[in-house]
Amino acid sequence: MENLSERFNALQDQLMNIYEAAEQTLQAQIKHWQTLRKEAVLLYYAREKGVTRLGYQPVPVKAVSETKAKEAIAMVLQLESLQTSDFAHEPWTLVDTSTETFRSAPEGHFKKGPVPVEVIYDNDPDNANLYTMWTYVYYMDADDKWHKARSGVNHIGIYYLQGTFKNYYVLFADDAKRYGTTGEWEVKVNKDTVFAPVTSSTPPGSPGRQADTDTTAKTPTTSTTAVDSTSRQLTTSKQPQQTETRGRRYGRRPSSKSRRSQTQQRRSRSRHRSRSRSRSRSKSQTHTTWSTTRSRSTSVGKTRALTSRSRSRGRSPSTCRRGGGRSPRRRSRSPSTYSSCTTQRSQRARAESPTTRGARGSRGSRGGSRGGRLRRRGRSSSSSSPAHKRSRGGSAKLRGVSPGEVGGSLRSVSSKHTGRLGRLLEEARDPPVIIVKGAANTLKYFRNRAKIKYTGLFRSFSTTWSWVAGDGTERLGRPRMLISFSSYSQRRDFDEAVRYPKGVDKAYGNLDSL
């Protein structure tokens, strides 16, 4: 008991000497934190032995002493690392190396030169908030190298420069939603207005926000909308003239067209092409061509794929088929329709030459109904849409792959229960990844722990890396690390099972190759 009291009094004397000397050296600050660590360890030991008071000093609970000891150890490690940098000979005070300054925004950095910044919300002087802008910010990169950066303020917030990158540690728009109602604020530095009142929806270049959309910019938008609606009406009224003069088949579609106007436009184009082609046919095929043109123009509205085939083969796929087969939609056919189709086939047979008839016979015209049934089956399967195929019992997983998903996969997927189409769609996608951002040591610890605890839930980890400024070699932002996976299901299982460390952010992505 007496030995603990004597040691505690000796540590108190050392702390008083440090405070009275007020040395502005980094070595004195390291000594100060080492003394605080010894004091916390001594109080922890005394509480563990059941001692509740050392002289006039009450002994706190063990959790408090443990927290203070860990805090002192962390500050000693930071200051010893700073002592090996180029900034060790700068003046450092007790305030500069205190935990309050170290934990204030931007958190985890040493800071000097506080400057008050006043922000007035809603143009109300009583509704103002004070912020601290630090003149200099000392931060460590992924290579444990210290850098000194200047801090600044603009209408977006308070930031410090990492090369040419502005790292904001205070955003005024976030507090404008909390303290204000109109979303407007005014920035003052040393009682001088630096930026006039701006709104939270209009700061240009604000991270995570849209471009300027103030009141003056909204007026032209309204007038443009009115002009667009007027032009849409004029376009609808002049639609027949446009369809006649338009010669290109795949012209650009106007965004304001409705589905009904698009269908009418396709029908008018089909009638125009069918009439121009029917004039160039031979006189012996006049009746056949006219009936084919009528059937072709009628079936245009249903499907474009069948229309293109009927146009190239000179017959309608929905009313008359060569092999006497049935229509894909209607299973029965009236006798009049069957007789008209028989008449048309006989007329075409008389008009065709023997050479054409022989060439067509080589493709399977013999066998009549059987050959027509085979050709009809091939046409219906090729012209049906993927959605129609899936509705017949296909797997819902066989969806199309967007252009952004196409890439080189690292492994060949299994063809079990998917078929050839499902295999191609799965192989078209890019390998998935997860990018994590945080402190370099935290990411390294997370990688080592995941390799042991989550084996089989990932493909590989990358080393920690950082972005580099375009005009220099200085690192920007926090360190990053990539985690690759063999499939999206593996990434989902990994994301559900893993626990990310505190202060680590994640994002999903995919790459063409690894």
UniProtKB/Swiss-Prot annotation:
Residues 430-514 are annotated as: DNA-binding domain. Belongs to the papillomaviridae E2 protein family. Keywords: Activator, DNA replication, DNA-binding, Early protein, Host nucleus, Isopeptide bond, Phosphoprotein, Repressor, Transcription, Transcription regulation, Ubl conjugation. The gene is E2. One of its GO terms (molecular function) is DNA-binding transcription factor activity. Residues 213-231, 285-299, 334-343 have a biased composition (Low complexity). This is Regulatory protein E2. Residues 1-201 are annotated as: Transactivation domain. There is a cross-link at K437 (Glycyl lysine isopeptide (Lys-Gly) (interchain with G-Cter in SUMO)). The keyword Cell membrane does not apply. Residues 196-424 are annotated as: Disordered. It comes from Human papillomavirus type 5b. It is found in: Host nucleus. Residues 248-284, 323-333 have a biased composition (Basic residues). The keyword Repressor applies. Pfam families: PPV_E2_C (PF00511), PPV_E2_N (PF00508). One of its GO terms (cellular component) is host cell nucleus. Phosphorylated. Sumoylation plays a regulatory role in E2 transcriptional activity. Plays a role in the initiation of viral DNA replication. A dimer of E2 interacts with a dimer of E1 in order to improve specificity of E1 DNA binding activity. Once the complex recognizes and binds DNA at specific sites, the E2 dimer is removed from DNA. E2 also regulates viral transcription through binding to the E2RE response element (5'-ACCNNNNNNGGT-3') present in multiple copies in the regulatory regions of the viral genome. Activates or represses transcription depending on E2RE's position with regards to proximal promoter elements including the TATA-box. Its main location: host cell. Binds DNA as homodimer. Interacts with protein E1; this interaction greatly increases E1 DNA-binding activity. Interacts with protein L1; this interaction enhances E2-dependent replication and transcription activation. Interacts with protein L2; this interaction inhibits E2 transcriptional activity but not DNA replication function E2. Interacts with protein E7; this interaction inhibits E7 oncogenic activity. Interacts with host TAF1; this interaction modulates E2-dependent transcriptional regulation. Interacts with host BRD4; this interaction mediates E2 transcriptional activation function. GO terms for biological process: DNA replication; DNA-templated transcription; regulation of DNA replication; viral DNA genome replication.
